[in-house]
Amino acid sequence: SVRDQYWAAKYKSWYDAGDAHEINMTMLENFLNMAEPATLQRMHGHYLASGFNTAEEVNGSGQQGPDALSIWWYNRNLRIFNNILRTKPGPEDRILVLFGNGHMPILRHCFYSSPEFRVVELKTLLKK
């Protein structure tokens, strides 16, 4: 659709600009940039803006985009979260989670929502 083409082009330009900028960053600077709420929101938005609600209809339902995103992508992230739970972390354990930025909005939601975890943002761990 025209909408999908528009957003695919927009996100490609954002990714290209980000790649050009990140090449001059240290790994730490890159991780800090990726952890910024605005970056996480923008990257998660790609899943919602491109091919999500304009996907071809299946059986006239018009729900192929949401179904694919929830069945495949949300499931994948819940499995990642579950694998972390399966390590049986204790109350004093610390866990560092490094995943691709596409996973982080959902994983952050899981960790912030779970009473078993207290999330500590990377930037708060750095010495000033």
Task: Show where each model-derived region lies.
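Hydrophobic, often amphipathic alpha-helical segments used for membrane interaction and targeting
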Residues: 1-90, 110
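A cross-kingdom marker for long, charged
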Residues: 70-128
